[in-house]
Curated annotation (Swiss-Prot):
This is Rho guanine nucleotide exchange factor 39. One of its GO terms (molecular function) is guanyl-nucleotide exchange factor activity. It is found in: Cell membrane. Residues 22-197 form the DH domain. Promotes cell proliferation. GO terms for cellular component: plasma membrane. The keyword Cell membrane applies. Keywords: Cell membrane, Guanine-nucleotide releasing factor, Membrane. Residues 227-331 form the PH domain.
Amino acid sequence: MESSGSAACCPVLQQRARWERKRVCTARELLETERRYQEQLGLVATYFLRILKAKGTLRPPELQTLFGTWELIYAASLELLPYLEEGQWGLGLQGFCPHLELYAQFAANAERSQTTLQAQLKKNKRFRRFVKLQEGRPEFRGLQLQDLLPLPLQRLQQYENLVVALAENTVPNSPDYQQLTRAARLVSETAQKVHAIGQSQKNDQHLLRVQALLSGRKAKGLTSGRWFLRQGWLLVVPPTGEPRPRMFFLFSDVLLMAKPRPPLHLLKSGTFVCRALYPMSQCHLSRVFGHSGGPCGGLLSLSFPHEKLLLMSTDQEELSQWHHSLTLAIRSQKSSTHRSVTAT
């Protein structure tokens, strides 16, 4: 009774009790979700991967591209689960961490996997019939193969949330504190790496799309190696005459101004001709009007060493988004230039 009373009055003991409750709750969630995750990994491995391999419906390179490191990820989960069931969280996660690179490899292959799936569904009748048949099994609960393939990447995000929470609610004098802290750090680093891979893949898709919109000799290789930020129509206000609509593509280092091809152009209808490239490292941006958020739109001024560009939009929200994106690009380029000068 005395011990219980002292615990109720001692803030340190109360805090430790809260940590322990959160730790137990998090560990239970990690265990239960790992069981479900392993079940889904096993279903895909059993009813898709291994049968396809045995039947030879897909050639080995296509099969490897479609599923990537799936079987190895499944094996890693099979190793981890018994430790979680026995409450040996630190030891289990310590043994699991060397397998985290499989998730980075899986992420790097994810775009090619989805492309391969769509291509095979379109051209391979045997594969299409097989996939439809297997997806109809009650074990998959209406999920399609394309919904199941991203499962490891979704689970990695869960790992990060749960393992970090487990480490944060473990007292430093706990036997598995060091193991859990290290595991949380490694899982978070892998999740960040996977996020960067995903961002790079999305950027590559944007660049391919933009490159397809640009035509003419000047357009070749314009998007190579760049980071896409945004695109849209803006009105260019000349010193004299009427404003002219132009399509703008903003990348991390340049602003590309393009003019649409004539609608009746025989070969290039719907594409754009590059008219100018403006380096963001040399840009000074200011908002001439449109600060108040009213309905009249606004005007941006972009000054370069040898040219001044006035861009107008009747949409106040769109202009604000352009101002924000341009500001980020300019700041990033000037910061990069400053670092380069400092390094030399």
